[in-house]
Amino acid sequence: MNTEVIAIIPARFASSRFPGKPLADMLGKSMIQRVHERIVGVVPRAVVATDDERIRQAVEDFGGEVVMTSPECSSGTERCREAFDKVGRGEKIVLNLQGDEPFIQKEQIDLLISAFDKPETDIATLAEVFSSDVSFERLNNPNSPKIVLDHGGYALYFSRSVIPYLRGVQPDSWCRRHTYYKHIGIYAFRPTVLRKITSLPQSTAEQAESLEQLRWLEYGYRIRVLQTQQSTIGIDTPEDMEKAIAYLRSQGME
């Protein structure tokens, strides 16, 4: 276990697509508890960062560490930075684990941390290849941001749209003709860079796509992207939750 890593799980109650999502029941446990259980034991500390008393109480009830943050935070990364400033103990790597990724796996977290074996890595995240038989409807889902990578494995752009556009090819064939990457919402930062990027003003692309990582790219920061072979189920809507619960039952994880 890497003792120089802290995981912070930003969680807010007021989601426009799924209000109260962190406390939604997943077969007897809240979603935030299932996310917390995924990270405990993988890194030395896991801290939930929230601005809501209901979430704070729920985390304390299951024995987790929690810190209250400002309701003015405009993104999960800003909440992560505030939490680290309050409770950090000099860790060298800060993980920002989204509170709607209850199926994140140990191997994925270890992979992300391994990015910092290279001293030039300041920010890292994960991507999964869309399989060749994925329908265009699923590829085109704006809740599953796509990444375009350079030859060195760094992000060129993130988009809710399908990029690149394949001219002259039927959309249902796109995944058979090109490799598309799905972004998995977990980040890792060096603390100095985390503080810098959260002090920057919002960028135009970030505002257009509502993807905070575009701010970092627009201001010249490089994001290293590691490819994972494991799939996850991110939960953005009540319909996603129904699929997640069905998956829990199918895996005997009740």
Swiss-Prot record:
Keywords: Cytoplasm, Lipopolysaccharide biosynthesis, Nucleotidyltransferase, Transferase. It is found in: Cytoplasm. The keyword DNA damage does not apply. It is an enzyme of class 2 (transferase). The keyword Lipid biosynthesis does not apply. GO terms for molecular function: 3-deoxy-manno-octulosonate cytidylyltransferase activity. Its EC number is 2.7.7.38. Pathway: Nucleotide-sugar biosynthesis; CMP-3-deoxy-D-manno-octulosonate biosynthesis; CMP-3-deoxy-D-manno-octulosonate from 3-deoxy-D-manno-octulosonate and CTP: step 1/1; Bacterial outer membrane biogenesis; lipopolysaccharide biosynthesis. One of its GO terms (biological process) is CMP-keto-3-deoxy-D-manno-octulosonic acid biosynthetic process. PANTHER family: 3-DEOXY-MANNO-OCTULOSONATE CYTIDYLYLTRANSFERASE, 3-DEOXY-MANNO-OCTULOSONATE CYTIDYLYLTRANSFERASE, MITOCHONDRIAL. Activates KDO (a required 8-carbon sugar) for incorporation into bacterial lipopolysaccharide in Gram-negative bacteria. This is 3-deoxy-manno-octulosonate cytidylyltransferase. It comes from Porphyromonas gingivalis (strain ATCC BAA-308 / W83). The gene is kdsB.
